[in-house]
Amino acid sequence: MLKTNQKNVHAFEIEKQEPEAVMEFLEKNHALLQYFLIIFKYDIESEVKAVLHKHQLLFLETNRALNGRYIKTTEKDANLLKQNSPNAIEPKTTIYERNIRSGEEIYSTNHLIFLGNIHNGAKIISEGSVSVYGVCEGAIVCFGEYLILKEVKSAQIVFQNKILSLKEVERLLVNKNIKIITKNDDILDIKEVL
């Protein structure tokens, strides 16, 4: 009997563009991209493949359309969905009062609240919103409506499929005040709360 495992995968989909831009993106973000499948919607160039192999990134070349959560819904569509499904289940919230250790990985469809620290080498991936009230040194991938961070010492942060740039991460490092990250269209908004 054939032994198989089913896995859910988070992916970055890259459309045809200049190889130099793709290589720059891969070089800059290779540490964070270790956690994703990179899907190229075209036959990639040999120099791009060399960068992918150099950093041991997992990738796929395909011309096939892939289904997924990349579809943008307008506010009108969202309101219509709410009207048509009043009993829609909201994600639950999970609270972690302990520290998340190096090497620990948490994958969740819930909203997550961390009262302790997230150590370097830990990885958090959540379909819901994430709040971290301790020191954050690990990788965070948040697909929720918001991301709340207090003391950040990590450059490995992804919010709604966007890897935070060095400039955005520097805004988080300024002080230990609580900051909330939201997204309006394609623009990240980082606000200091306290």
UniProtKB/Swiss-Prot annotation:
One Pfam family per UniProt: MinC_C
InterPro entries: CAP/MinC_C (IPR016098), MinC (IPR013033), MinC_C_sf (IPR036145), Septum_form_inhib_MinC_C (IPR005526)
Alphabetically ordered keywords of this record: Cell cycle, Cell division, Septation
Superkingdom of source: Bacteria
Cell division as UniProt keyword: yes
GO biological process: cell morphogenesis; division septum assembly; regulation of cell septum assembly
NCBIfam families linked: PRK00556.1-2
Family as reported in the entry's similarity comment: Belongs to the MinC family.
Subunit structure: Interacts with MinD and FtsZ.
Biological role: Cell division inhibitor that blocks the formation of polar Z ring septums. Rapidly oscillates between the poles of the cell to destabilize FtsZ filaments that have formed before they mature into polar Z rings. Prevents FtsZ polymerization.
Name of the protein described by the UniProt record: Probable septum site-determining protein MinC
Source lineage: Bacteria, Pseudomonadati, Campylobacterota, Epsilonproteobacteria, Campylobacterales
